[in-house]
């Protein structure tokens, strides 16, 4: 097993590039924007809108190379309208005519998110698949966040990984227009 180093990060460009590469084959990303060259720009827009700004952003390194990232939002976090407005041009650039699909996703999942305060794992992705990067990022995050946690798995193959960290599937949601399925998952507070 490779020993990875986890570092906190404020480098939105680096994190966006990692996530853009990590999600190149993601079913939801493909539905949202088939042009994989725009993925890093889309994650940059999401980070500009505020994801991770008050929570934690971890980068997983193998030697000196960044190979994964996780973005957590703290309980009660809602991006400010100013940050969201600042991100609109980035969203439009990344999504083009598919901007409405991004809004649909946000609107759909608002109803599945837990009402009680919780940590939200907005994104976790690895450029090295199947090598323990995701597990390392999840372990670090789960050791650091206190209280319940929530995520939306866009890939059914990742559900067993999240289940190993105590998450359970709470619903199965199919996106419109012949879209893929997404699985909201929740983990109660330890104890």
Q: Locations of the language-model features?
A:
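Conserved acetyl-CoA-binding loop-helix of GNAT-fold acetyltransferases
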Residues: 126, 130-144, 164
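Conserved acyl-donor/pantetheine-binding loop and adjacent beta-alpha core of acyl/acetyltransferases
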Residues: 69-129, 176-180
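A short helix-loop-beta-strand connector motif used in the catalytic cores of GNAT acetyltransferases and
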Residues: 42-59, 114-117
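Conserved GNAT acetyl-CoA-binding A-motif
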Residues: 115-122, 144-155
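A short beta-loop-alpha structural element at the N-terminal edge
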Residues: 3-17, 21
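C-terminal "cap" of GNAT-fold acetyltransferases
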Residues: 151-159, 175-191
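Glycine-rich acetyl-CoA-binding "A-motif" of GNAT/NAT acetyltransferases
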Residues: 65-68, 157
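Conserved GNAT-fold acetyl-CoA-binding loop/helix
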Residues: 24-45
């Amino acid at each position: 097993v490779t020993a990875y180093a986890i570092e906190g990060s404020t480098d939105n460009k680096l994190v966006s590039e990692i996530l853009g590469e990590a999600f190149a084959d993601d079913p939801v990303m493909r539905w949202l924007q088939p042009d994989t060259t725009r993925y890093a720009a889309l994650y940059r827009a999401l980070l500009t809108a505020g994801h991770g700004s008050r929570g934690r952003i971890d980068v997983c390194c193998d030697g000196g190379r960044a190979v994964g990232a996780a973005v957590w939002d703290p309980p009660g976090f809602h991006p400010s309208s100013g940050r969201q407005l600042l991100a609109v041009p980035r969203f439009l650039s990344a999504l083009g005519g598919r901007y409405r699909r991004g809004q649909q996703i946000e609107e759909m999942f608002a109803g599945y998110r837990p009402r009680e305060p919780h940590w939200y794992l907005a994104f976790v992705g690895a450029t090295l698949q199947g090598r323990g990067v995701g597990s390392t990022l999840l372990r670090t995050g789960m050791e650091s966040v206190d209280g319940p946690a929530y995520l939306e798995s866009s890939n059914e193959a990742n559900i067993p990984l999240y289940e190993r960290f105590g998450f359970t599937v709470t619903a199965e949601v199919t996106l419109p227009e012949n879209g893929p399925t997404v699985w909201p998952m929740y983990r109660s507070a330890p104890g």
